[in-house]
């Protein structure tokens, strides 16, 4: 007896057809469990390319649910991701100036979400702007009705604060499909008569040794890796070049042998995080998808090995 079910899919960067198939399988299962509203959650940086996968999956879910309209907003103000006049900001800069333009798999070169989404879908895309949101749920509902009458299928929604998300929430009551980052979720529980729970604060403290596994190449993660190293804590880099030559298993074993005696003294860091020029050089040799998969599989093996060493408190940053 639960109020919400999360199905975690690795569908962000796989071929669009596979992402659609996985998402539709998840939808069928959720419908069989009695789900009343489907929430297609994606990253607050709207990671995608003109091929997808946000647009194609959204379209497929809309078709399967028989709905002609949904919203799209990755806004997550608590994490500095806001949408204003349809443009996505990361902190105080446009997304395409934030470092996300250098993402190794989904470089984001345009912060205009209406344009980005329109490139990925055949349905018309429009905007519910900040002025409409500020007037509350009824005005938002009226704007939705007007857009539907115009033949719009997807509306990007402005949100610069949690207050905006809480105003948006009631307007989404009864909408078969919501697509968004995780931020929009804060405005939905009240639609189902749910109140904040103390359950999370009652969970037992985590146990086990501590480790960080980092594969993200974002500006923020590069800075975090540099900070961790500056504190003097043990850190070991995984070289994509070493993995390229069929040495993945040997590299993983080397990392675990290094980490084993250190874990008892505090957290260790294993990272493949690199500057954009390094990433591009590896991609040029291997191809974008192959380079990502190579590092991903190595880090997964490292994470499993760390868990076997009682590194049961893992912080995983991308990859």
What are these regions (language model features)?
Residues 82-84, 191, 248, 280-283:
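Short, well-ordered secondary-structure micro-motifs
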Residues 3, 15-19, 24-165:
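Cap/lid and interdomain-hinge subdomains that line or gate substrate/regulatory clefts
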Residues 91-255:
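Conserved, well-structured core segments that form the ligand-binding/active-site neighborhood
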Residues 257-317:
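C-terminal structural cap/anchor segments
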Residues 6-10, 41, 71-75, 156-160, ...:
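Short beta-strand segments
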Residues 27, 61-69, 252-266:
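Short amphipathic alpha-helices and their capping/turn segments at secondary-structure boundaries
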Residues 8-19, 228:
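Glycine-rich phosphate/pyrophosphate-binding loop regions near the starts of catalytic domains
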Residues 3-6, 37, 69-71, 152-156, ...:
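Residue-level preference for the first positions of well-ordered beta-strands
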